[in-house]
């Protein structure tokens, strides 16, 4: 992970990073204007400097995500162009290379198409974030009004404590606080609702894209198996290529797998090390309590079953005093025996 648990704290390098340092930065990264374009940086800074103060941070996030979308559009377009170039290059090679590169171009072009579809779904996440920003912007005036009235009251109490405007302003402050409470409650509710919906859009679309990318990668590896990469000596001819039907079938299988994929078929399932809700904890505990009476002696592997000792007594009339004496002697003998042990 880029950071440990939080983006707000620097983290120490892991043992794996110390043992195998990451590769140097790509030579295609910008060295003069930073990691973002000038236009993207300008839009983000402008969003953080203008508009209602409450909505500025979220405005910066929305503008940043717009830059992400534009970057993904470029990636999707360039990937499709790269797929075409791969197919054109392979056409001038031997039959096996020509066929495999042509089919690989089909798969790589599909990667660009999937990214293009992902952009449309990703934009729904950004639009939902904008609705939170709009609510924050609408709440800001009520906050400003309440603060303004509070400042006026404090100023009058300091300058002219007997002013007749103070009671009027206090009544206005009560109304402003009531309006602010309603607006703050709406902001709290809508923020949680829209935040959950927005990132559900994003993670569902990201999950779909990742799973489909993994499918295409698997079929791409299958295509590579059709290439005979065994070395040949000078003058030796390679065996004739007969993988046309196999490569065609691989593409058909890939298309069928992508069309039939649904979110329920996702292969990667998250595993959590804690209970999701309190009800889960109580359900597990209740289940354990219900199962406990059903366990009998000998049901648990490795359990030692102790036989019940049965005391055989004969009904012989005994004198009460003699019985008490015998009972006292048996208790003393038991105590001394336990001490010896």
Swiss-Prot record:
Annotated organism of origin: Saccharomyces cerevisiae (strain ATCC 204508 / S288c)
GO BP term (any one): response to heat
Subcellular location as annotated: Cytoplasm, Cell cortex
Primary residence: cytoplasm
Name of the protein: Sphingolipid long chain base-responsive protein LSP1
GO-annotated molecular function: lipid binding
Biased composition (Polar residues): 1-11, 330-341
Region (Disordered): 1-32, 282-341
Key words of the record: Cytoplasm, Glycoprotein, Phosphoprotein
UniProt keyword Translocase present: no
Function: Together with PIL1, main component of eisosomes, structures at the cell periphery underneath the plasma membrane that mark the site of endocytosis. Negative regulator of cell wall integrity (CWI) in unstressed cells, probably by inhibiting protein kinase PKH1/PHK2 activity and regulating their downstream CWI pathways PKC1-MAP kinase pathway and protein kinase YPK1 pathway. Activity may be regulated by the transient increase of sphingolipid long chain bases (LCBs) during heat stress.
Coiled coil residues, start to end: none
Leftover remarks: Present with 104485 molecules/cell in log phase SD medium.
Modified residues (Phosphothreonine): 233
PANTHER family: SPHINGOLIPID LONG CHAIN BASE-RESPONSIVE PROTEIN LSP1, SPHINGOLIPID LONG CHAIN BASE-RESPONSIVE PROTEIN PIL1
């Amino acid at each position: 992970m880029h950071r440990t648990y939080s983006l707000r704290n620097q983290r120490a390098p892991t043992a794996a990073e110390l043992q195998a340092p990451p590769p140097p930065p790509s030579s295609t990264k910008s060295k003069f204007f930073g990691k973002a374009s000038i236009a993207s940086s300008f839009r983000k800074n402008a969003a953080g400097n203008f508009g209602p103060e409450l909505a500025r941070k979220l405005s910066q996030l929305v503008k940043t995500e717009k830059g992400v979308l534009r970057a993904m559009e470029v990636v999707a377009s360039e990937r499709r162009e790269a797929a075409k170039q791969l197919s054109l290059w392979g056409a001038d090679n031997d039959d096996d290379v020509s066929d495999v590169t042509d089919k690989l171009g089909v798969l790589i072009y599909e990667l660009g198409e999937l990214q293009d579809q992902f952009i449309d779904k990703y934009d729904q996440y950004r639009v939902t974030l904008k609705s939170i920003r709009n609510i924050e912007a609408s709440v800001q005036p009520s906050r400003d009004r309440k603060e303004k009235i509070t400042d006026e009251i404090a100023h009058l109490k300091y300058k002219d404590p007997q002013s007749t405007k103070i009671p009027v302003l206090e009544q206005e402050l009560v109304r402003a606080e009531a309006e602010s409470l309603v607006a703050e409650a709406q902001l709290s509710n809508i923020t949680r609702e829209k935040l959950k919906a927005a990132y559900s859009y994003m993670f569902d679309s990201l999950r779909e894209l990742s799973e489909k990318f993994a499918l295409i990668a698997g079929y791409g590896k299958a295509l590579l198996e059709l290439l005979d990469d065994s070395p040949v000596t000078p003058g030796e001819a390679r065996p004739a290529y007969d993988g046309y039907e196999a490569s065609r079938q691989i593409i058909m299988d890939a298309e069928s797998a992508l069309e039939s994929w649904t979110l329920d078929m996702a292969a990667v399932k998250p595993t959590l090390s804690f209970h999701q809700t309190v009800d889960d904890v109580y359900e597990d505990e209740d289940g354990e309590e219900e199962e406990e009476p059903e366990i009998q002696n000998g049901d648990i592997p490795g359990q030692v079953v102790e036989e019940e000792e049965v005391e055989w007594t004969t009904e012989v009339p005994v004198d009460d005093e003699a019985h008490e004496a015998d009972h006292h002697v048996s208790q003393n003998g038991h105590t001394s025996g336990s001490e010896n042990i």
